[in-house]
Amino acid sequence: MGKYNLILSEYLSFIYNSQSAVQIPIYYSSNSELENRCIEFHSKCLENSKNGLSLKKLFVEYSDVMENATLLSILSYSYDKYNAVERKLVKYAKGKPLEADLTVNELDYENNKITSELFPTAEEYTDSLMDPAILTSLSSNLNAVMFWLEKHENDVAEKLKIYKRRLDLFTIVASTVNKYGVPRHNAKYRYEYEVMKDKPYYLVTWANSSIEMLMSVFSHEDYLIARELIVLSYSNRSTLAKLVSSPMSILVALVDINGTFITNEELELEFSNKYVRAIVPDQTFDELKQMLDNMRKAGLTDIPKMIQDWLVDCSIEKFPLMAKIYSWSFHVGFRKQKMLDAALDQLKTEYTEDVDDEMYREYTMLIRDEVVKMLEEPVKHDDHLLQDSELAGLLSMSSASNGESRQLKFGRKTIFSTKKNMHVMDDMANGRYTPGIIPPVNVDKPIPLGRRDVPGRRTRIIFILPYEYFIAQHAVVEKMLIYAKHTREYAEFYSQSNQLLSYGDVTRFLSNNSMVLYTDVSQWDSSQHNTQPFRKGIIMGLDMLANMTNDARVIQTLNLYKQTQINLMDSYVQIPDGNVIKKIQYGAVASGEKQTKAANSIANLALIKTVLSRISNKYSFATKIIRVDGDDNYAVLQFNTEVTEQMVQDVSNDVRETYARMNAKVKALVSTVGIEIAKRYIAGGKIFFRAGINLLNNEKRGQSTQWDQAAVLYSNYIVNRLRGFETDREFILTKIMQMTSVAITGSLRLFPSERVLTTNSTFKVFDSEDFIIEYGTTDDEVYIQRAFMSLSSQKSGIADEIAASSTFKNYVSRLSGQLLFSKNNIVSRGIALTEKAKLNSYAPISLEKRRAQISALLTMLQKPVTFKSSKITINDILRDIKPFFTVNEAHLPIQYQKFMPTLPDNVQYIIQCIGSRTYQIEDDGSKSAISRLISKYSVYKPSIEELYKVISLHENEIQLYLISLGIPKIDADTYVGSKIYSQDKYRILESYVCNLLSINYGCYQLFDFNSPDLEKLIRIPFKGKIPAVTFILHLYAKLEVINHAIKNGSWISLFCNYPKSEMIKLWKKMWNITSLRSPYTNANFFQD
């Protein structure tokens, strides 16, 4: 404890280093006597600082406070309006500033020209192509780096080398930024024309990326990669990341497998010591050579040399360097193009008549048959979800944009908003709601567009379709996904699997007589040639399905779905280009429909099947697996003979030729040992993930607060670290300090302490120890948690006003009325709350709530006020358990080989001792009988929180709850009267606790919690039949053991003697646990 507070104090002295600056620490304690001393101490500090006296004497006088109380926050003030950044920067700006090469990029605006050359006037200016979109500024980032450098200038040995490497790289950044002056951001952290006009347009986003890279430098190799990327990304804003990461798709095919993990029948990973040789035809080496040449042409030298050196013996031991280069390439930042170029990109492809109609026919038929297969059962059985598809759609309507701003009346309040949910309410109130009519998206009503930016790829456009499209597609797509959930081919949706399962699936069938074909079909998904056969296949499937039922409502659902496909075959988009809005006929498939993911997966599966059926005319092989995962598909083919170089080359060329016959511009590769797809890559029998999450640049702006973004920053840092890209932790902590500080006045600022930011309260931002989620059980921790709970949710006047309007009330009661067969307060209140929560995405409401939250927080950070809360948190439960455990030292041998080489050592060690898990632990209650019963008769999906509440009610209340949702009385009676109900109580509690303990997030998702090796370290004598208590005791013990191992690299064993009398008490408490949402949990969820 306390590392953060120490750095915080040093950081404040670094930033406010003038005479007038003062730091006042604020302490608190759960002990009332000590708490009084804390209050005295604080008021005397304020008194002294007002009179300009030193605080040193007070620190001595109140040493009891400083030793025994807990730091709550630091109040800091300084009269210096600090343009200190510029002053400090000069010290580092000793090098030669970079000069941008203005001819590197094809599109003029992607060259790093002076802003006024790209945008001659303020009216033409837009920051949308370089907006870092993050609530922290370049000056803060520079400060954070300079703080680190100053703190470490006296390091020795290996640490000194790191310091020198980073200093050298920072000199490049500082000199370049200093040449033009540090761009000042406005209150919204944006960079305006006045600031940018005489500076290079991409200066800010480049500097942010460069800082992120240089603060991730440790070794000499890191330094070489970073230097090259920093220097080149200053000029090349378009293709650098793609150039650097391209070779990976071939590199994975060059490494022999010598021992690997495979999936066994029980879907667990098990070690197999098979040897598979990498068989690589010359053609592949030629392609790789071409890629390296392209890199050199673009000015890269060190990176291609590293790859070249590795090629000498292609060893898996040195492969992590290749993985590192691949990950680093993404940290050059997002490629943000103009919308017009993004749209035209897909329309440029030449349409040729010279295509294989037979293959297209087969492709369309496969799509048709798959759609039929997916929906056949629900349609034949007149599934209630397909009957009540409209209601289901309304219940899960998002609060995203509906594409146009409208003026809406809620009671006496008139607002204008683009949000779907508000438009639906307004339309219903005014009799304009017609879900049975799908509006056209033709030349008269072109589709407005959103965008998706990603490093190393072009900007993609997203359709923002009217909400009728969502309602028409929702129910059908949900049914498709349910089918995909138990179909192994759909790697992305397959039931509770994680990426390790997909890894074992590939390695399972690799051998000397098989090869794996992997294809990136992202180009095909958005190509014009895809759209006709794609939509027609879906339409034909829907027509066949409509003949399988006589239910008018199901037929209506299918027809509306069909109508969305028909409309989209004639689609136009609107693109703002300067002041004009261009209408362009857009013939390709874009994201934005509800069906995007499901339908793309269907199409990609159909595509690879079409190609394989062609190839099988020429070769004799068995298809061992076919998988599709997002934009990628792959298949393992097993031949009767050993694979030779000639075979690999022939198959490879035939596959490419087959794709070419459909005019599909795709990257198809064949290998014997590894694959590379967007989500993961397998090389030498080991699995790797790309650690490419940008920290200091964001894709887009949302309505999250600085606190939220600080939590997301930390969460991104953790994910990158697990994947092998480590950024200096002190730097991350410094960013968190900057982003969580609260300004009181111009010169007064409050910085929360570690305790505030790491206790699991509604304000939690990060973990005091990476990878370990701690639930504080000391008096002070529980005290502060209670204090924060008292100010958890803030009211918003606007939201209350909208919620009180008849428009809103009628909407909610219409939903309840359609859903419920009898009164059910839990559900009605749930719907009302959900709808009210959706209003949060309307900016004025979130702003209002944020202001209230900040002012409450300010009060709290200066003096915590507790209230006697009846709420119980998971901390209280663990606090009750803790005293009954005794700890002993233990020993666990390493017994599993490494298969994820990029993991940090301490996490790797645990997997090597207890093994890994290939499944997600169920934490949403969907496996419980009650959840299944509800989904059998109703479109309503209760959350885990609601199930947890309901299952602990009296039996007759549960019956009423079920009956009101349309479950027949006989089923409800049977349920409550059976054993299943008591199993459900346990099951749902278990899910709920797993959910609270974030078992499926961070590094916990990698560990096998049911490992016998882990079990044997825990001894809990069995007393009485309270499975829920036994469960929580075991889970707590496992987490304690694992956390200790992460921290210390050694094992402990736990013995628990839990008194039977306490068990009943604990069991009762366990039914009143409150769940806490925090920026931290939201960030975890956001990762998903």
UniProtKB/Swiss-Prot annotation:
One of its GO terms (biological process) is DNA-templated transcription. It is found in: Virion. The keyword Magnesium applies. InterPro entries: DNA/RNA_pol_sf (IPR043502), RNA-dir_pol_4-hel_dom (IPR042032), RNA-dir_pol_luteovirus (IPR001795), RNA-dir_pol_reovirus (IPR007097), Rotavirus_VP1_C (IPR022071). Its cofactor is Mg(2+). Residues 501-687 form the RdRp catalytic domain. Interacts with VP3 (Potential). Interacts with VP2; this interaction activates VP1. Interacts with NSP5; this interaction is probably necessary for the formation of functional virus factories. Interacts with NSP2; this interaction is weak. Belongs to the reoviridae RNA-directed RNA polymerase family. RNA-directed RNA polymerase that is involved in both transcription and genome replication. Together with VP3 capping enzyme, forms an enzyme complex positioned near the channels situated at each of the five-fold vertices of the core. Following infection, the outermost layer of the virus is lost, leaving a double-layered particle (DLP) made up of the core and VP6 shell. VP1 then catalyzes the transcription of fully conservative plus-strand genomic RNAs that are extruded through the DLP's channels into the cytoplasm where they function as mRNAs for translation of viral proteins. This is RNA-directed RNA polymerase. It comes from Rotavirus A (strain RVA/Cow/France/RF/1975/G6P6[1]). The lineage of its organism: Viruses, Riboviria, Orthornavirae, Duplornaviricota, Resentoviricetes.
